Structures are given as structure tokens and as C-alpha cells.
């Protein structure tokens, strides 16, 4: 299919460019994760020439662009780094921050629940308030008019990144109240455990 070929050509060009750049700046102390080794099999042999951190950073833009290609192929509109602007009531902003704080304390006061969290924020979100702006990594508009806003992170996001994703989901939902909107977060699949058993992961995904 054309979309598959477009993704293949994009990844080939980006990985080739990254590898050429990385061979000029050695960093010997880092070892690739299982995920990186699967993506670039030769990484284990030559990883001393590259930086794991720079690889994580670079792949973040790859996932976003691939999602953009796929979204544009299936939906009416696809835009990267799309600004979201609208009024945010003081009550909604305060409730978003309260949700985040309640999830941050130990023992956890509140367990994340997408439907409940969004519903509570929309209940206190009015039509007035200072204009606020945020940015969506990827905006898609379906043929039925539904708006989809994605916050995209690299595999295994840390606690701060998970909190940021949750805040963006709730903020976008509030800013687009009254529209047919889905605010979502996405991470590339991380096959850290070769058995594919999620219960066998060496680390737990932070919950937000």
C-alpha cells in the first residue's frame, strides 16, 4: 500500500541520517534497551558511537510523523503541532490541578479514570474565562466531524511526562467543550519484555 511505502521510505531516510550523525559523536557508556535493539538490530554492535538519550529524542519525532502520515491517509484532516485556543474557566483549571495533585500523593487519593476525570472537568467548565492555549502533537478530524487531539510520547514515559499527558487531555477537553472531541495520549509500543507478557515488565507504567 502507498502509506506503508511512505512510512518505509521515511524511516529509512531518518534512521540513515541519524546513524550518520551519531557516528561522529561517540558516547561509550550507554547500552541500548531491548526496544532500541529490535528497532535497529545493529545498534548493539555499534552503540558506543551513539547516545541513548539522543535516540529517544529523535524517535519521538518519528512516531509523531508516522502517526501524521497514517492519520492523513484515513481521516479528513491531519495537522502536526496544532494550537488549541479557547476560554478556560477558573473552576475548570483549578479542578484539573486538583485531579493531578490527588493522583500524585502517596498513598494515592485518586485512581485515574478517563471518563470520570473528563466529565468532572466539563461539569465545572463554563463559557467564560481567560483565553488559554496549548498545543496538540497531532490533530485529526474524522470525516464525521469528530476532532481528535493526540499527545504523543516515547516508549516508557516517566512520571512527569505522564502527568503532562493527563493535563493536556483534560485541558483540551475543556477548551473544546461543546464540540465532538476526543483528547488522547499515545506511546509507541515498547516490547521491553520479549515474552510479550505485560505482567513481566521490569518496570511499571506510571498511572495518569
Where are these predicted regions, by residue range?
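Active-site metal-binding core of divalent-cation-utilizing nuclease and nuclease-like domains
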Residues: 82-143
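Active-site-adjacent loop/helix micro-motif of nuclease/hydrolase catalytic cores
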Residues: 156-167, 194-196
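Conserved catalytic cores of phosphodiester-cleaving nucleases, focusing on short active-site segments
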Residues: 71, 136-140, 144-156
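Domain-level recognition of nuclease-like catalytic cores that cleave nucleotide substrates
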Residues: 182-208
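Surface-exposed cleft-lining segments at the edges of enzyme active sites
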Residues: 52-56, 121-127, 151-160
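Nuclease-adjacent, charged terminal/linker segments that flank catalytic cores
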Residues: 1-87
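Arginine/glycine-rich "motif VI" loop of SF2 helicases in the C-terminal RecA-like domain
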Residues: 174-180
Amino acid at each position: 500500500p502507498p502509506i506503508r511505502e511512505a512510512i518505509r521510505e521515511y524511516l529509512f531516510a531518518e534512521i540513515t541520517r541519524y546513524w550518520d550523525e551519531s557516528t561522529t559523536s561517540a558516547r561509550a557508556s550507554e547500552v541500548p534497551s531491548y526496544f532500541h535493539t529490535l528497532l535497529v538490530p545493529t545498534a548493539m554492535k555499534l552503540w558506543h558511537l551513539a547516545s541513548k538519550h539522543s535516540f529517544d529524542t529523535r524517535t519521538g519525532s518519528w512516531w509523531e510523523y508516522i502517526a501524521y502520515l497514517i492519520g492523513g491517509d484515513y481521516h479528513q484532516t491531519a495537522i502536526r503541532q496544532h494550537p488549541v485556543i479557547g476560554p478556560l474557566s477558573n473552576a475548570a483549571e483549578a479542578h484539573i490541578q486538583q485531579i493531578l495533585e490527588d493522583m500524585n500523593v502517596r498513598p494515592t487519593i485518586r485512581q485515574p479514570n478517563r471518563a470520570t476525570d473528563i466529565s468532572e472537568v466539563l461539569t465545572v467548565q463554563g463559557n467564560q474565562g481567560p483565553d488559554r492555549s496549548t498545543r496538540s502533537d497531532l490533530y485529526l478530524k474524522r470525516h464525521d466531524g469528530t476532532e481528535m487531539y493526540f499527545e504523543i510520547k516515547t516508549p516508557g514515559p516517566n512520571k512527569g511526562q505522564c502527568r503532562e499527558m493527563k493535563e493536556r487531555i483534560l485541558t483540551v477537553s475543556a477548551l473544546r467543550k461543546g464540540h465532538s472531541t476526543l483528547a488522547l495520549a499515545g506511546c509507541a509500543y515498547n516490547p521491553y519484555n520479549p515474552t510479550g507478557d505485560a505482567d513481566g515488565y521490569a518496570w511499571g507504567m506510571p498511572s495518569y
